[in-house]
Each structure stands twice: as structure tokens, then as C-alpha cells.
Amino acid sequence: IKRELPVVWFECVRLLEAYIEEFRPRMVLSVGQGYPIPPVLIERIGINLCSGPDNTGEIDLYEEPIFPQGPAAYFSTFPYQAMHDRLQAEGIPVRYHFEAGQNQCNCVLYSALHLAATHYSGMTAGFIHVPMLPDSEKGIQGMNLEHTARAILCCVEEAAKALRRPVRTLEQYRENL
């Protein structure tokens, strides 16, 4: 199920929560457009902080918490190593990124992880930044649409595979050492 969220402070959170409530997904993969050059960035951490203007230009925040009672940060619950390895195997430039900034992308990542931790147990959440599409007139190297779509599909497939794996307890893990 694909849904587009507006780049508007807290409206994106309200809609994200409404979509999660409506569809009750087992995973939420959010995708944002990142930099004008590759690689794909697998975001590892969502922080409870937002700063900067939104696309309306009406709201400009400075280091405001997304959820005032929430923890400082959450780690993505996606299989980031499997996603990274798969994209590398596909020849798609990729790297880990350890925080999604303080903008809307981070707001969406943190919100999805917070909702998973507080209301939707068992739901996994993560975020990837894909490069902009190439634009020679603007001097943007970017990444072509085919590679971008392939990167997103590979990440969805790896996240879905992880959902099917049985979860082992720490005791079960230790027994296999």
C-alpha cells in the first residue's frame, strides 16, 4: 500500500498514524528523496527532534520534540544489514546513515518507530533516502528511476523476508553458540 505524506510539520504524523490505524501493516517502509548524488541511504536512527521550515513556509520549528513524552531516539527495526547487502549485490550504491536529520524525513521515521513501540507491537519501521533523479540542466547526477525503483523493491523484499523469520529469544541464541 503506497501513501504519500505531505512535507508539513505534524500533518505528516497525523496522516501516518491514520494510515497505520486503517491498514494495520506489519511493516512501514518510508522513502524520502535525499541528495543529488548516490548512494541510497539506509537510515538507522530516528531522533525526537525537528527543526526547520516545512513546505508551506508557515511553520519553522527549532529543535522541537516530535513526541514530548517520547524517548530521545529509536533505532530502525528493519534488517538494515540484509538490505545493505542486497543493494550492494544488485550493484546499487548504498550506505548506512545514522540519523535522518531534523526534517520531515526524520519526523516520519521517528513517528513510525514511536507508534510501533507504543501502539502497534510487532510492526517494523524504517526509512531510506533515495537520490534525486538525474537533471543535467541543474547539474544533478542523481540515480535513474529504474535503479531507484529497484532499490525500493529490494528493501521491501528484505524487510518482508525478515518478517517471516522466527524470532529467537536470547536463550535460544545462546544455546546455538
Language-model region placement:
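An accessory alpha-helical subdomain
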Residues: 129-134
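Active-site glycine-rich loop that binds ribose-phosphate moieties when present
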Residues: 105, 109-111
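N-terminal catalytic or cofactor-binding beta/alpha core of small enzyme domains
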Residues: 1-102, 113-122, 142-177
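Short coil-to-beta-strand
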Residues: 123-127
